[in-house]
């Protein structure tokens, strides 16, 4: 594994580090360091959450729902959603590329629980 990119984002006071396996830069792990030392939630296992890019966030969330997965934060904006793994790890889903057009039923769905 090697550091692909490292950058400081001064406006929101974080440092981002992207790690990738040699010869496979498509699969990255993003580590975020919060300069203010924000406390992690109970059961966080020392990290905030995992994130994955998906080709169509609406289709992906619908497939998850069809399998009984609860969407904690629906993709109302056509760009981002949150779910939790069976053992409580928060997982962020991000639309690959530009956000999709906002549409129903997603835009009216409410948040469920925490993420």
Please give the residue ranges for each predicted region.
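Short aromatic-enriched loop/helix-cap "lid" or pocket-rim segments at secondary-structure transitions
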Residues: 16, 43, 105-106
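Short amphipathic alpha-helical surface micro-motifs
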Residues: 1, 11-16, 31-35, 63-65
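Vicinal oxygen chelate
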Residues: 23-26, 33-90, 95-98, 115
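A short, polar/charged loop-to-alpha-helix boundary motif
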Residues: 98-113
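Core segments of cupin and vicinal oxygen chelate
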Residues: 1-26, 84
């Amino acid at each position: 594994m090697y550091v692909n990119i490292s950058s400081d984002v001064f406006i929101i006071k974080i440092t981002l580090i992207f790690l990738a396996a040699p010869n496979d830069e498509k699969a990255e792990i993003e580590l975020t360091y919060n300069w203010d030392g924000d406390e992690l939630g109970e059961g966080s296992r020392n990290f905030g959450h995992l994130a994955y890019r998906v080709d169509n966030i609406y289709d992906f969330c619908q497939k998850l729902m069809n399998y009984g997965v609860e969407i904690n934060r629906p993709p109302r904006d056509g760009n981002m959603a949150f779910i939790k793994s069976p053992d409580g790890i928060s997982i962020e889903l991000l639309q690959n590329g530009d956000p999709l057009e906002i549409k129903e039923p997603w835009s009216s769905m409410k948040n469920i629980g925490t993420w």
